Structures are given as C-alpha cells and as structure tokens.
Amino acid sequence: ILTKFDKSKNKERLSEGQIIKMLVRYITVQKNNTTNLLKKIVIHRDGKLFSLERNGIFKAIQLLKEKGILPDDVSVNIVELPKHSILQLRLFEVLKEYDVLHNEEDDGYVLNPEIGSWIKINNREAFLCTTGREFKHNGSSNPLYIKYPIGNMDIEHIIEDIYYLSCLAYTKPDDCSRYPLTIKITDRRINIL
C-alpha cells in the first residue's frame, strides 16, 4: 500500500503530468525496496477516473516498462469507488419469512447483513458491505459500490482487497469504516490541507 499526496489545480482531478511524475517516482521506490517482481498494480480512484488521469497512468506504466522497473506483462487494474452511487442497493438478512404486505414490524427477523457480505452485479461491478450488524450503528448498512472499468484481475479479488483495506479503521480500531484505507486516508489528508 502506497499513499502519496499532491496538490492539484483542479479540485477533483490530477493532471496527466502529475500522475506520470508520482507513479514513476513511487513505483520505482517500491521496486527498489523489494526483491519481488511487481506483477499487479491496483489503483483505487475516489470517484470517477478522468481520461487525462487514465492516460497518465498508462504513460507512466509504459515508461516504467521501458526502464525495466515493471515487467512487460504487468497487470494494471483501476477501481472507481464513488462516495454516492446512482444505483441504490440495500442488503438484508431475513431470518424468518413473514408477510411484508401486512406486517410493518419485522419482529427482529430482518437484520443488517454481516460485514463483508457482497453481491456481484457483473464482472465489472459489485456492492460490498464494509459495515454491518456486527457494529451497532443506526439505520441500514449502505453497501459500497465498486466499479472496475480497467484490468484483468477477478473482481472477487478486487472485492476482497477492498474489504480487507476497509477493516483497517486506524482512527477507531473497534469500529468499521465504509471506505478502504486507500480512500479514507486521502480524505482525511485533504480535510487537513
């Protein structure tokens, strides 16, 4: 996990040049500090990935391949994690059937999902419950929408990584975090700047 910060003139996006500069610099640092071959790179984008950012990512990867820092067959995977999805979905666990048309009360038979529950929409989209009934919060769990537009990893591995990173709730270790550490730490940093 590598999180670095850089100010941008544009509020919600980085320039192509910024992306190239940061990725080349910090992937080189990662390579210099490991004996392992860097075979998979996963980039988490808070919100929508802009075309200039995508271009910067692939230009940086190409430069790193040309320098011999990355192998030619490196897998580049990009995940978009919007704060708000246009698709609204709630997951529940129903312990016992009851007549929902006539009974307004569920008598405790409808619970928030277990943390880590997920549903795959297709090979490029899924919802993941990074919060759940194990942590007492008011309301229903709001699953995180995962969009995986670029890459060749199985979406199940992408979901698993995001779940594990969401368990790193360093600001409150006895609680859960809706967002993975890769997004949460950046949000906290931006709020300080």
Label every PLM stretch briefly.
Residues 1-193:
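Long, contiguous domain-sized segments
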